[in-house]
């Protein structure tokens, strides 16, 4: 089963912008927040004194899909249109580089759970993404780059992502099936 990741990725980017107080289409957001490269060994390295945030969304290998069905049609209409919601567990991996790496990681960790209009949690919830409360504190590391050191903060947040699948219409019990009788 294949699900498009784009709407979820857009919602995560928007939530990061809300956490950091940046406009979604701002130049600062585009320079600061990046999706992780598929081949990290070939990824360009930002300057040591520049802040940058890389992130990726990985499905939890121990994730068993949980499905629920919802029937939005009122009773007695004769048709049932069933929407099935499948929930999968994901890990949101965030790696912050630069002098303010720890501050950014802590800010994302604390702000991601704020609710209300325009706040990160609502942005995620509207896209069917639900952060699991109480993530661990970010791990602070120092990477050697040549003869210099780069500050790094790693943060992992567990998410439940809900996908919507529209099932076909089915006849209700109220509408009698067509029966052909041959003699």
Regions found by a protein language model. Give the residues of each.
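Small/polar-rich, solvent-exposed N-terminal microdomains that initiate assembly or binding
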Residues: 1-76, 181-183
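Residue-level signal for secondary-structure boundary sites
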Residues: 63, 102, 163-167
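Short, charged, solvent-exposed linker or helix-capping segments at domain edges/interfaces
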Residues: 65-68, 166-174
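"Short basic amphipathic alpha-helical interaction patches in structured regions
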Residues: 69-71, 106-112, 126
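Short beta-strand/turn micro-motifs at beta-sheet edges
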Residues: 77-83, 144-145
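Short, cationic low-complexity segments
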Residues: 79-80, 172-183
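Oligomerization/assembly interface segments of phage tail-like spikes and tubes
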Residues: 84-102, 108, 150-161
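Acidic-leaning, charged glycine-interspersed low-complexity segments
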Residues: 103, 113-162
